[in-house]
Amino acid sequence: MSPGGGARSARSAGLILFRCSGGEVEVLLVHPGGPLWAKRDHGAWSIPKGEYPADEDPLSAARREFAEELGSPAPDGEAIDLGEVRQKAGKVVCAWAVAGDLDPATITSNTFTMQWPPRSGRTQEFPEVDRAQWFGLSEARERINPAQAALLERLREAVER
């Protein structure tokens, strides 16, 4: 419950892994798994993130979600606070960025189960993240969920300081 007595809005915490390559900032984005996302690309990619309970520290949740979705622990190092954004459906995403490197070919995501095909009565298991990829900031802005694009701009500003 929120302090006002109502239900707390859904909140997610995420961690953007970034690196500088050839003078350009690159970010590691993830693509959601499952049949509903299989043919979507532009606007479908995201930072590794997930919901967390009210009693969990958001940065700890971001690090946990990174490990769950990529199968690799979040890198140690300074976490740059990128603030919050509100997604279209109202979910608030708080994010941090950490410098590091990860080979996208090595990711192993946690999974989820859903009925597929719809109304078939059969369930299938799918990876929460079906792939990860490094993008320069300009291409990342085209691929990422539009509500999360502000996080990329904040990262650019933080790195340029």
Task: Cite the ranges covered by each PLM segment.
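N-terminal strand-loop-strand
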Residues: 2-47, 96
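Short, solvent-exposed loop/turn elements at beta->coil junctions and helix N-caps
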Residues: 3, 80-87
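Short, charged/polar surface micro-motifs in flexible loops or helix N-caps
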Residues: 22-24, 34-37, 53-54, 89-90, ...
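Residues that scaffold the ATP/ADP-binding catalytic core of kinase and kinase-like folds
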Residues: 39, 55, 143
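The catalytic Nudix box helix
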Residues: 47-82, 136
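Active-site-adjacent beta-strand/loop module that shapes the phosphate/pyrophosphate-binding cleft
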Residues: 84-121, 133, 155
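Alpha-helix-centered segments that form part of catalytic cores
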Residues: 122-138
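Charged phosphate-binding loop/patch that engages nucleotide di/tri-phosphates or the phosphate backbone
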Residues: 133, 137-161
